């Protein structure tokens, strides 16, 4: 499968030091690649870039890891077979 993991774009992936969500996304990418999947990390705060990457990436699965971007879920849904949204922040 071709999988997109969408990060918040706050810090790089993998992070230099602390970055729990960023490290989790990195770990997911490594494990999924080891299982034979093609994985792309999209890590930008620019929602237009995210929409562009997903629209033209032809992904089977898109996993959004930042609930602040929830308003673009409807834009992403037509461009993948499965759309997953997770929140990792204790608001």
Residue ranges and their predicted role:
Residues 1-91:
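Catalytic cores of nucleotide-sugar-dependent glycosyltransferases that transfer UDP/GDP/TDP-activated
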